[in-house]
């Protein structure tokens, strides 16, 4: 069964061309310098409509489906994982707004998300609250006309460039209530190279890979947000509201993994045809042929599972199980494929002369962020043991 139509493939061709012309020529150099995605690239992505793939036309989006969204993420990530990731936060915020936002919040933010002028970042994780997000302690205290936010957040990716932060905070001070006392807020700020906000301090976290989008530790001190920044105008619903975004976020993450895996496979395949040892191309040696075969199997299995989960969501069905499976499979596949690609290149795979080492470093993060593989397995197990 094919989940991808000719229209999907036509869209893929356009994104592939964009990636080859705009992303691939600059990715390795910027990665090596640990520099961020140039804003010119963000602007060009916006002009192509990539930020608005899932949003309705009434909000200046393209009104397309989740399969298209996964294809865009996949093709951009083939060039550089971080470029394919820029859209993830928009997908999360847009999903939150469409499901739970007030009419005013939708009108205020969704058109900007669709056109790339609103660049969000997610401030959910805390130093002592990772997978156990219900244990977070950041406070949102009611005050005249709004709330004061106080506390710390961690691993807030793209916090510097973002002009709005999605912040999950505790509106009920009783921590024993766990997820029942959390609320979602939108905190507006200036987009800059560093964190620019009078009451928010932040420092970037050095990372092994996933360069192009810096992740930050943030400290909030009496950050005032007006009442209309509370998602849906409802307190203590933030955890439940956030759950609606998990499916799309995990689909998009699985697609990013497939993109990185495809890039590594393509490079290793071409190298194996050109590199000669023992008087013939190494692709003619059985050991290398077996590696290439296994890599292809894992790649297509991850891709098709991702498309299948996306097709379920497009049909209006829940796909939290399938999206979780797709993310787990894609995370495993990208680690395996990038590792094997390095092995096929031998010493050159460990060299910064070729991009395979970048694929390897970038691919490793997939099993950690957007819900660890261990958490995904818990979700899967609960579903099958009902």
Which residue stretches match the model-derived regions?
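Alpha-helical interface subdomain recognition
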Residues: 1-79, 83-84, 100-105, 112-117, ...
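Short Ser/Thr-interspersed hydrophobic loop/turn segments at strand-loop and sheet-helix junctions
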Residues: 49, 73-77, 168-170, 187-194, ...
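Short Gly/Pro-enriched turn/cap motifs at secondary-structure boundaries
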Residues: 86, 113, 128-131, 155-158, ...
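Helix-loop "lid/cap" segments that line or gate small-molecule binding pockets
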Residues: 91-100
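A short, Trp-centered hydrophobic/proline-enriched beta-strand micro-motif
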Residues: 116-125, 168
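A short core secondary-structure module
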Residues: 150-200
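Flexible, small-/acidic-enriched active-site or ligand-binding loops
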Residues: 193-222
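Long, acidic (Asp/Glu-rich), low-complexity accessory segments flanking structured domains
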Residues: 221-240
């Amino acid at each position: 069964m094919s989940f991808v139509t000719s229209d999907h493939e036509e869209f893929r061709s356009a994104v592939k061309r964009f990636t080859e012309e705009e992303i691939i020529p600059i990715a390795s150099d910027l990665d090596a310098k640990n520099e961020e995605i140039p804003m010119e690239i963000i602007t060009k992505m916006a002009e192509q409509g990539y930020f608005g793939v899932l949003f309705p036309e009434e909000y200046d989006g393209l009104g397309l489906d989740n399969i298209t969204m996964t294809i865009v993420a996949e093709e951009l990530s083939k060039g550089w994982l971080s470029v394919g990731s820029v859209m993830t936060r928009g997908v999360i915020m847009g999903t939150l707004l469409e499901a739970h936002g007030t009419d005013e919040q939708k009108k205020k933010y969704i058109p900007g998300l669709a056109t790339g002028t609103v660049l969000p970042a997610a401030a959910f994780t805390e130093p002592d609250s990772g997978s156990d997000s219900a244990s977070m302690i950041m406070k949102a205290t009611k005050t005249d006309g709004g709330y004061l936010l106080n506390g710390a957040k961690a691993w807030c990716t793209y916090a510097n460039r973002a002009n709005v932060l999605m912040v999950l905070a505790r509106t009920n001070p009783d921590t024993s209530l766990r997820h029942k006392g959390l609320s979602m807020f939108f905190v507006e700020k200036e987009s800059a190279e560093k964190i620019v906000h009078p009451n928010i301090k932040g420092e970037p976290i050095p990372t092994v890979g996933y360069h192009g989008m810096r992740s930050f530790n943030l400290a909030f001190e009496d950050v005032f947000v007006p009442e209309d920044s509370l998602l849906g105008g409802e307190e203590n619903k933030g955890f439940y509201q956030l759950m609606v975004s998990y499916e799309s976020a995990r689909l998009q993450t699985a697609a990013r993994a497939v993109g990185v895996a495809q890039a590594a496979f393509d490079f290793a395949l071409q190298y194996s045809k050109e590199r000669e040892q023992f008087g013939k191309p190494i692709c003619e040696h059985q050991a290398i042929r077996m590696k290439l075969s296994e890599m292809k199997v894992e790649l297509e299995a991850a891709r098709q599972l991702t498309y299948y989960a996306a097709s379920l969501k497009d049909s209006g069905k829940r796909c939290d199980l399938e999206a979780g499976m797709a993310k787990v499979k894609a995370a495993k596949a990208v680690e395996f494929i990038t590792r094997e690609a390095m092995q096929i290149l031998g010493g050159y795979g460990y060299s910064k002369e070729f991009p395979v080492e970048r694929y390897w470093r970038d691919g490793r993060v997939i099993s950690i962020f957007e819900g660890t593989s261990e958490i995904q397995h818990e979700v899967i197990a609960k579903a099958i043991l009902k």
